[in-house]
Amino acid sequence: MTARNSLTIVLAAGEGTRMRSSLPKVLNPVAGRSLLAHVLSAAPHGERDRLAVVIGPDHQAVGDEAKRVRSDAAIHIQAQRLGTAHAVLAAREAIAQGADDLLIAFGDTPLISAETFARLREPLHDGSSLVVLGFRAADPTGYGRLVVQDGKLTAIREQADASADELKITLCNAGVMAIDGKIALDVLDKIGNANAKGEYYLTDAVGIVRDLGLTASVIETSEDEVRGINTKAQLAEAETVMQTRLRLAAMAAGVTLIAPETVYLAADTTFGKDVVIEPFVVIGPGVSIADGAVIHSFSHLTEAKIGSKAQVGPYARLRPGTSLGDGAKIGNFVETKAAQIDAGAKVNHLTYIGDAHIGASANIGAGTITCNYDGFDKHKTEIGAGAFIGSNSSLVAPVKIGTGAYVGSGSVITKDVPDGALAVERNVQTAKDGWAKRFRDAKSRHRKPKAH
């Protein structure tokens, strides 16, 4: 049997005024990924699946994000915001191309899963013409109720229109829907706007399908999974749910989180085996951590690659472009950016390494700074394998420190250092006998008496 194809339409044209943000609502992040990106990543994306995203006329950034996440996404503009059904029909061209299953979702529900999208399609394969995603609300106030009889969906009843018995229903409408592609346009075109707001509501599709003598049904998911994000408070709630998911998944994969509730992960964080994450670690997007690595407390990592049995922190900041080789060590109060640090190299404390390549087993002393920026451009520092950089050294890029070379403590290095050489740049130390006493005596003579 040939697999059914699908078209998923993601509605992302909302203004999001309650977010009180200049950023379009669906671009706000949860676990380092935009709300929209979470939904697009969960939507079907096989060879026989298509994707359309409906955006507002003034939200080009939303379209750009959709294309970044899913290059196959077709972007459609809802010129006027006249309701959910009107938004779906903004993608009329995509619907008209045909699909076995039409899925409709919202760009502000980041917790929806690929598994739920798959389950939403199953009743269409078994004779239903329309499927609505529902959830059991802890407090159903304000939600549309799903009225079910004999296992079939008979109506979506908004709270203002619900009877006393219907108000007791806790099964609520999540807004996500699947429609048989053969009837989708016919059903959508029959939706009218004879209501107080003059808008076209997708929920009216249930009655239209039943009037056609066809079957509508419901599948259920958790309330968490269909949380819509309209305020910063709801954004924080979604972050909490997502972080719990990510932590549980990490621990199930063999990661040791010593205090899970204090560790923050990104949606794309990847781990090897036997990784240990100590309390109060923040991992941003683009981080991979290989087998046996340890991330000590109060470290912050973004777009960094951590090798096997490497160590980071405590109190380390790894910025984008950092790569640690196997067994490398980044210690306390070290910041790195665009830095390749090869196997076994050590940067133990109080150091900035930017735009640099540190060779295998090199040792970088406390207080070393790679001076990579001249006010206009960044420049690279190269430190050879086995090199030793003494404490409190400044390496003024562009500069190369040779294999096995030494740099004496306190040096300001502006020229390349050959392999195996020692480079020292200091003024001659002098000592002036008796100077301290003369200084104190002079200060005492000029000091004003203290007031009593």
Swiss-Prot record:
Q: Which InterPro entries is this protein grouped with?
A: Bifunctional_GlmU, GlmU-like, GlmU_C_LbH, Hexapep, Hexapep_transf_CS, MobA-like_NTP_Trfase, Nucleotide-diphossugar_trans, Trimer_LpxA-like_sf
Q: What does this protein do?
A: Catalyzes the last two sequential reactions in the de novo biosynthetic pathway for UDP-N-acetylglucosamine (UDP-GlcNAc). The C-terminal domain catalyzes the transfer of acetyl group from acetyl coenzyme A to glucosamine-1-phosphate (GlcN-1-P) to produce N-acetylglucosamine-1-phosphate (GlcNAc-1-P), which is converted into UDP-GlcNAc by the transfer of uridine 5-monophosphate (from uridine 5-triphosphate), a reaction catalyzed by the N-terminal domain.
Enzyme class, broadest EC rank? transferase
Q: What's the encoding gene here?
A: glmU
Which of this chain's residues are annotated to bind Mg(2+)? 108, 230
Q: Tell me the GO molecular function terms.
A: glucosamine-1-phosphate N-acetyltransferase activity; magnesium ion binding; UDP-N-acetylglucosamine diphosphorylase activity
Q: Which Pfam families match?
A: Hexapep (PF00132), NTP_transf_3 (PF12804)
Q: Which HAMAP family match?
A: GlmU (MF_01631)
Looking at the record, which segments are called Pyrophosphorylase? Answer: 1-232
SUPFAM superfamilies from the UniProt entry? Nucleotide-diphospho-sugar transferases, Trimeric LpxA-like enzymes
**Subunit-level organization:** Homotrimer.
PROSITE patterns for this protein: HEXAPEP_TRANSFERASES (PS00101)
Q: What is this protein called?
A: Bifunctional protein GlmU
